[in-house]
Amino acid sequence: MAEPWAGQFLQALPATVLGALGTLGSDFLREWETQDMRVTLFKLLLLWLVLSLLGIQLAWGFYGNTVTGLYHRPDPHPQPPAAMGVFLPPGLGGQNGSTPDGSTHFSSWEIAANEALKTHRE
């Protein structure tokens, strides 16, 4: 069975931890306020973060539909790529824009050269 002092210690632990965190926070704020350069740096970094997020949001507004059209998973009732406004070269356009299953990884101009393709055994 637990000693009575162990129970008292566990009850006082959250108050002690919160007091230490409060002291640490007030010391940090006091140091922060005396350093004008830190405040300026913080404001600049915060401004940069906000502008970056706004830029990402703006870019997604312009190009989001294009990206979604290029990287979507095909549905059970597939439509031709031209119907989605995506024009792919012949032989490309599997799931997520990769090469279809069973195709080679060579581009069409290398295959059209009428060269015998080497396998990994050669």
Curated annotation (Swiss-Prot):
Its main location: membrane. Residues 30-43 are cytoplasmic. Residues 2-8, 65-122 are extracellular. The chain crosses the membrane at residues 9-29, 44-64. It is a multi-pass membrane protein. The keyword Transmembrane helix applies. PANTHER family: T-CELL LEUKEMIA TRANSLOCATION-ALTERED GENE PROTEIN. This is T-cell leukemia translocation-altered gene protein homolog. The gene is Tcta.
